[in-house]
């Protein structure tokens, strides 16, 4: 996209700050953890929402520690305070925070708005249609993006330049490049990884990532996918929240074939469909056999450990039932035997 490249060219004049991003991974039938995508369109994705997982984990440990009058104090390993301190620190001494948002549904704003306000910051939200006429109001504050790519690309050069100069979180490179699922294809290209990783690091990354193919790349694999839908999954390269994601085993033959006929596949990436491990879980007394999608919470060059996991009876979460899981890091058998997973 020419417009996108123009914005990225101007952004390249500024040192890269990744902002917040959330790599997601699946668990294969063999137990391998495999990265499937990175969510980084919106600031704070997972950073704040995982607070609820910390609370649930704390309650769980307190409950089993007080059973039978044992009074055991099971420690909770959590990076909650560390990650909240970091997202407060990056605002610096700016007292005003401006959130620029699209119509996309997100629960994060409802969490980080009161968080920053509790620390004496004033938080104001501008809908996408109000962003351009309020440049003079937001450009001197700490600017947070909750804008999707379509809205960002609709803004004038003056508006995107103001976002760059304001040091908007997230950086356009994070929004347009890291969030784009085509980025994962580069992890398997020596010409790319040789510039930033050692051979050992590249091999490790590839062993924990799902191979990702671009349209027009490896025609043999794309043709195999067209014939054998159950072995593959198609994903729109830009969208999130499982929008325009077609898992072969869950997609009827006509819908699958139609994506080739009308050219939709040209805007998609292709991945092998990973057969995932199922976990027996109990939710409000009902037994489920769930797939698990894990997440990694990251900000700039820092990794803040696991956030809130998602569980679903379908191999693609967000397209059907969607439940939440709180991770607890422990090697204590007294805790492990009480956990669902």
Task: List where the protein language model places each region.
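Residue-level marker for buried hydrophobic side chains located in beta-strands
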Residues: 21, 32-34, 232
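Hydrophobic residue at the +6 position relative to the catalytic HRD Asp in the kinase catalytic loop
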Residues: 23-25
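Short solvent-exposed loop/turn micro-motifs enriched in small/polar/acidic residues
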Residues: 17-20, 289-291
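Domain-scale recognition of functional cores that engage charged ligands
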Residues: 28-30, 42-48, 53-341
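Activation of the activation-loop gatekeeper triad in protein kinase-fold domains
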Residues: 38-39
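Structured beta-strand/loop patches that form or line metal/cofactor-binding pockets in enzymes
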Residues: 9-19, 277-283
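Low-complexity, highly charged intrinsically disordered N-terminal segments
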Residues: 1-7
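Short, solvent-exposed loop/edge-beta patches enriched in aromatic
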Residues: 16, 27-33
């Amino acid at each position: 996209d020419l417009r996108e490249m123009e914005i990225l060219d101007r952004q390249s004049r500024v040192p890269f700050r990744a902002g917040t991003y959330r790599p997601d991974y699946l668990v294969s039938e063999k137990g391998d953890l495999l990265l499937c995508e990175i969510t980084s369109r919106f600031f704070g994705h997972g950073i704040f929402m995982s607070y609820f997982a910390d609370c649930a984990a704390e309650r769980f440990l307190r409950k089993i520690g007080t059973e039978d009058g044992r009074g055991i104090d099971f420690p909770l390993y959590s990076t909650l305070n560390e990650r909240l301190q970091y997202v407060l620190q990056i605002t610096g001494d700016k007292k005003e925070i401006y959130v620029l948002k699209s119509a996309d549904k997100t629960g994060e704003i409802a969490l980080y708005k009161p968080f920053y306000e509790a620390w004496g910051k004033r938080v104001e939200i501008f809908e996408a249609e109000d962003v351009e006429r309020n440049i003079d109001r937001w450009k001197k504050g700490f600017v947070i993006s909750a804008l999707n790519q379509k809205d960002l690309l609709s803004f004038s050069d003056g508006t995107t330049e103001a976002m760059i100069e304001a040091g908007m979180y997230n950086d356009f490179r994070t929004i347009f490049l890291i969030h784009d699922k085509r980025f994962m294809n580069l992890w398997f290209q020596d010409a790319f990884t040789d510039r930033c990783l050692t051979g050992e690091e590249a091999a490790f990354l590839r062993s924990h990532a799902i191979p990702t193919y671009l349209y027009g790349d490896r025609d043999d694999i794309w043709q195999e996918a067209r014939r054998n839908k159950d072995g593959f999954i198609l994903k729109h390269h830009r969208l999130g929240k499982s929008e325009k994601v077609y898992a072969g085993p869950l997609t009827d033959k006509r819908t699958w074939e139609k994506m080739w006929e009308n050219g939709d596949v040209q805007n998609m990436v292709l991945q092998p469909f990973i057969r995932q491990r199922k976990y027996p879980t109990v939710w409000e007394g009902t037994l489920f056999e769930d797939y698990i999608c894990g997440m990694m919470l990251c900000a700039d060059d820092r990794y803040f450990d696991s956030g809130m996991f998602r569980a679903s009876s379908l191999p693609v979460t967000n397209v059907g039932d969607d439940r939440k899981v709180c991770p607890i890091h422990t090697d204590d058998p007294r805790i492990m035997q009480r956990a669902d997973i």
